[in-house]
Regions:
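N-terminal amphipathic, basic helical "cap/leader" segment at the start of enzyme domains
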Residues: 1-72
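Short, surface-exposed beta-edge/turn micro-motifs
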Residues: 12-13, 75-78, 145-146
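Short, electropositive alpha-helical surface patch
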Residues: 131-146
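Small-aliphatic-rich amphipathic alpha-helix that forms the alpha element of a beta-alpha
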Residues: 1-3, 79-135
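Helix-biased detector of long, well-ordered alpha-helical tracts
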Residues: 46-50, 63-67, 77, 82-93
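C-terminal helix-cap and adjacent tail motif
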Residues: 144-172
Length: 172
């Protein structure tokens, strides 16, 4: 059965799942090239100069990014959620509707992994090279990638809440 919920805009959405080792290795190479582009684009805004560096535990995020870079080719399955249509020239309403629908699907997918002992994270850096990834996987150019999700067994199941800003700092 279907494991993901969809929003009101239920146009064509798909989860492209890849478990072929050679293809995953090529995907990892594209991801790492895109990460190099991202790092170059940040310029001096890295390390302690990064905007998020003041968030408690932010060094763990950097460590996780580096670990994923080094081990992405070893992940059992990589998933790219896609939806039909491009948002670049769409109205704000249509953009929000398209993204709002795929976000529900992806979040449901990630929650469905948990009781199976699996986990993932939402990565977007490959989008610097979305066309290259699409060509590798045969994804039509009129589909938008919503991210890249490495899927693997978790190390334990004792997940804890992450640090969050106090609610009075985020509500207007």
């Amino acid at each position: 059965g279907e494991l993901v919920e969809r929003g009101a805009l239920t146009g064509s959405q798909d989860l492209v799942a890849v478990d072929d080792r050679a293809t995953i290795a090529r995907m990892a190479a594209i991801y790492n090239a895109a990460m190099d582009e991202q790092i170059r684009a940040l310029g001096d805004a890295v390390g302690e100069n990064y905007a998020g560096a003041s968030i408690p535990g932010s060094e763990k995020i950097g460590d996780s990014v580096q670990f994923l870079r080094e081990h992405l080719a070893e992940v059992p399955v990589l998933v790219i959620p896609v939806f039909a249509g491009r948002t670049e020239n769409a109205s704000v309403f249509l953009q929000a509707s398209m993204w709002g629908s795929i976000v529900q699907s992806v979040w449901s997918f990630m929650l469905a992994l948990r009781p199976r002992g699996l986990g993932s994270c939402w990565t977007t850096v490959h989008l610097h090279r979305e066309r290259e990834m699409a060509e590798l996987l045969g994804i039509p150019h009129h589909y938008t990638h919503a991210g890249l999700f490495p899927v693997a067994y978790t190390q334990g199941t004792d997940f804890r809440p992450a640090w969050r800003r106090p609610v009075n700092e985020v509500l207007f």
